[in-house]
């Protein structure tokens, strides 16, 4: 399963570890993903999403109904 946020689409990024001697080795920056259940009042059920911390803030700001409507418009839910 991919490490991708269901709401924002954020995934791993690639960068470098940089040592004190300025040696560089490749590494991955993983998004802060959490499985969360959200109660959808209009549907009277729980919805389980894998979301990043940024997506949690987005859901707090816009509401779960607006976020789910956007997901369905994109064809992801």
UniProtKB/Swiss-Prot annotation:
GO terms for molecular function: structural constituent of ribosome. SUPFAM superfamilies: L28p-like. The keyword Nucleotidyltransferase does not apply. Gene3D superfamilies: Ribosomal protein L28/L24 (2.30.170.40). Signal peptide: none annotated. InterPro entries: Ribosomal_bL28, Ribosomal_bL28/bL31-like_sf, Ribosomal_bL28_bact-type, Ribosomal_bL28_sf. GO terms for cellular component: cytosolic large ribosomal subunit. The keyword Ribonucleoprotein applies. It holds the Pfam family Ribosomal_L28. One of its GO terms (biological process) is translation. Keywords: Ribonucleoprotein, Ribosomal protein. It comes from the Bacteria. HAMAP family: Ribosomal_bL28 (MF_00373). Belongs to the bacterial ribosomal protein bL28 family. This is Large ribosomal subunit protein bL28. It comes from Variovorax paradoxus (strain S110). The lineage of its organism: Bacteria, Pseudomonadati, Pseudomonadota, Betaproteobacteria, Burkholderiales.
